């Protein structure tokens, strides 16, 4: 957790202790007044978070963590949390990317897939072809934007696979192979569209739109009125796709990074 508000008054003098690898405590007379954590994501990137009520405690924790960890290091902040954003910038991190969170209405007009393409509903995709498509998409990302530009949940995992639950994926099939996919997760009552991807050689034919409107239609039939999705502001195609379906921006987060010295 990152602290968003700092209390006023006398700033405490604290001692920063590294408890275990990846965890720091700020101690004021043996009382914990702040915590810092470094988490390594599947692609190897290290993300920082600090929980502290006093600005000076935040600064001391962040400074100790940055001194102990190899760079680059990253953090993610709600863009409306100006104080927290300023705190990380004060520590030397700079904004690297911005993601918009969209609220997506499920009442959309279905988009028909192009001739020869069929939509395989979630839960019906064959495991082998789905994982093969996953490998193709990952290879194309490696050759293009790179995994650092992708959300954490689609990053390559230690086993070399990003498919955790095949039942969450609807796919587009053409000529006996899977050429596109969409994944929906539901951690809360509002479903999250976590990934929409189409093979590079099959893009710009309306496959992504067909997959997405199919998925939204299924949610609508289940009585769900909205879903949400996060889109990198630099991804012009994804932004255009979601906004063409009536999605509206609800909030934004920024990823900050401090590069190696």
Per-segment meaning from a language model:
Residues 49-53, 78, 199, 203, ...:
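Residue-level recognition of the GNAT/N-acetyltransferase active site
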Residues 52-118, 254-258:
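Acyl-donor-binding surface of acyltransferase catalytic domains
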Residues 74-77, 193, 227-231:
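Conserved hydrophobic beta-strand within the GNAT/NAT acetyltransferase core sheet
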